Structures are given as C-alpha cells and as structure tokens.
C-alpha cells in the first residue's frame, strides 16, 4: 500500500486536523463547565486525538459526498503512516499520547495488519469502523467530562508496545529522518 502514501492525503489530514480543533464539544453536557476544566491534565492529549480522528472522519464524509477527490485508501494509509512519523518524536507528549491511543485502538480492532517482514496493511472496512467508533468514544468522553474514563483510556492504550518500538527502531537504524529539514536563508539563495 506504499503507493497510497501521498502528499495530498497528508496535507488533507493536517488541514482537517486543524479544522477539527474548532469543532466538537467545548462545554460538558451537564452544564457544569468546560471540557478542559473537567478533564484537567488529560484534556490536551484527548483534544489532539479528537482533532486527528475527526479530521479523518470529515475527509471520509466529504469524499463520500464527492467534495474531496482522490482515493479514500490514500487518506487512510497516509493517516496510519502519519502515526509512525509522529510517534517518532516521542510518545509522552499530547500528540504522541493521542497517536499511541489511536494506534492501539486501531490494532485492537484489526484496522491494520502487520506481516512477518514488518509491513503494515490497512483494512479499509475495519479502519472505517474503528474511525467511527473512536470518534464517538472521544466525543462522548468530552461531552460527559469523564475524567476517569479519559485517564483509563490513556492508561490502557497510550503505551508504546514492544513490537511498535522495534519497528520504530528499524526506521531509526535505516537513518530515515523523522521530518524534512529545509535549509533556508540568504546564503542558501546565494544572496550573501
């Protein structure tokens, strides 16, 4: 599925992640305050997780309506690949925690498989189902202001398991960069 990792899908994932930050529940449904206050130190990672999964949810719905071109497989495969990229920066901060929860949530639901050579393959139907379920789970946790539920979700799924850790180490051993570094400035442009 390597051919399904595309710039356009990565750009859409990033753009709709940012759009999703502005959507969703800001105040708990019981009217007792903000989601941020209710979820305390757990709110940041869950908000990042919400933005990621609702971004993919929006992509899916727009694609179904014919408003977004390309292959849905491009978006899903690129989305999974983005988890590997992001987790390499660290699994302990908000984005990393959200990525680990999502990766393990997807794994538990068979949204992807891993072969003996360490190649991952997205199962489109199971990925779609897991995306829908995780979207609903996160929105419910936020709406209910369920601090204990959010903390339990992170404790259960927000862990870097040995197999993924080994796969990430393989990427590092091959000197595959975490991100692109652009050289900029007057000297690079020959203006000095």
Residue ranges and their predicted role:
Residues 56-152, 156:
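Long, well-structured alpha-helical subdomains associated
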Residues 139-192:
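Extended, compositionally biased alpha-helical segments that mediate assembly or anchoring
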Residues 9-26, 51-52, 56:
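Active-site recognition of the HExxH zinc-binding catalytic motif
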Residues 2, 30-31, 65:
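Short helix/loop segment immediately N-terminal to the Walker
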Residues 25-49:
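Post-HEXXH active-site segment of zinc metalloproteases
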Residues 44-61:
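An active-site-proximal "capping" alpha-helix that borders the catalytic cofactor pocket
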Residues 1-7:
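Active-site scaffold of zinc-dependent metalloenzymes
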